[in-house]
Swiss-Prot record:
This is Thiamine-phosphate synthase. It comes from the Bacteria. It holds the Pfam family TMP-TENI. GO terms for molecular function: magnesium ion binding; thiamine-phosphate diphosphorylase activity. PANTHER family: THIAMINE-PHOSPHATE PYROPHOSPHORYLASE (PTHR20857), THIAMINE-PHOSPHATE SYNTHASE (PTHR20857:SF15). 2-[(2R,5Z)-2-carboxy-4-methylthiazol-5(2H)-ylidene]ethyl phosphate binds at T142, I143, S144, G173, I193, S194. Belongs to the thiamine-phosphate synthase family. It comes from Limosilactobacillus fermentum (strain NBRC 3956 / LMG 18251) (Lactobacillus fermentum).
Amino acid sequence: MLFKNEILRCYLIGGSQDTHHDPDEFLTKVEAAMQAGITAFQYREKGTSTLSKAETLALGQQVRELATKYGVPLFVDDDLELAAAIKADGIHVGQKDQRIEEVLAAVSDQLMVGYSCNTAAQVAHANQLNVDYIGTGPVFPTISKDDAGSALGVDGLADFVEQSAHPVVAIGGISLDNVGATLTSGCAGLSMISMVLGADDVAGTVKKILELY
């Protein structure tokens, strides 16, 4: 699958740890989000996840089926073996994950590649790499990732957007109250976890996000 900036517009991230460690609830909410129009999904079974490697693979295969059904690009967080096993469309690499250069060499243009950048130095490094996009944040305080770091704010995000040679997807503390302000940064899109997976009305939340573009 070829990368397009539009993939980043409404980019959902998550795993069973984001739905009370309930894989069934996770799949139900992911399907509702895909049906409502999310533009990408990143399978991220991490942090407080209690799934075994086999369970993570089995759940990932179900996510792959949903992504195929709804035509949603599927990324895997920091696991080349899993990405290959479920035939993901892309992989996302964090600063604390496998070295980005090793990932780029391994995928050899077969997968879309995203890269987390949270400082100006990291963005400058990314500018020298053949990645498809960078994820930058947290824009606002967040509890979805326990290692997220301090918030950049919209102005900090805008500085990174200007510096980056790649499209930027914003992450961290995104809510319906701040979507509009976040988009003024010039970012290509928004990524979220709890805003969608923690919502009572997943489909309604996704549709409201898309309406704000």
